[in-house]
Amino acid sequence: MTEIVAEISGNHGGSLRNALRLIETAAEAGADAVKFQCFEPERLATRRVWRPEVWALSGGVPLVDLYRKTHTPKEWFPILIDYAEFYDLKWFSSAFDPKDVAFLETLDCPRYKISAFEMLDWDIIKAIKETGKPIVLSVRPRCGLTILEATQYEGIHWNTETELGLSAHGKRAPFPGAPMVEYHLRLNDVETPDASFSLRMAELQEMVRIIRG
């Protein structure tokens, strides 16, 4: 059965209460899990500054400013994790830097996602692989070559603990047999940089209905 993941991303708009509301919304919509994003704005902006495809998606906003608006403070993570577990939601996180992985390991992160933009970042791949935890690779249209290149990294032996999951922007049903599909979730009354490609609760409920058949 396809696992349905609600991506919290930066749709909390810098509010812990909104982040908790997103977890409540994910549970009410029928998601199986929530995913967080763990990064420090300055470090992520530095690591991505040379990526033209990232700049193309930033709308001309300096990357560090964009990431400051969308990051989830590390001090929130224990609270968010407890809240997700209260609602019987599984949780995991993306990590974008080896230091993020080290932090998430202190919280016993059960699995990690490598985002599409980091799939050829050998430092983060190595750091995550060394945890021994399951890994989720992000699948987007036309990224097959990138996945192939990522799996050729020396010392990385991808196995049954590596999953391919569709990271969907907007309303997109998963490809048949997908083990996982991830949708960005938003609140009706909060506008954020991620809101335009995120689903409201009713839309996520509809996708759950379609996927579950």
Label each region the model flagged.
Residues 1-213:
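Catalytic cores and adjacent flexible loops of soluble metabolic enzymes
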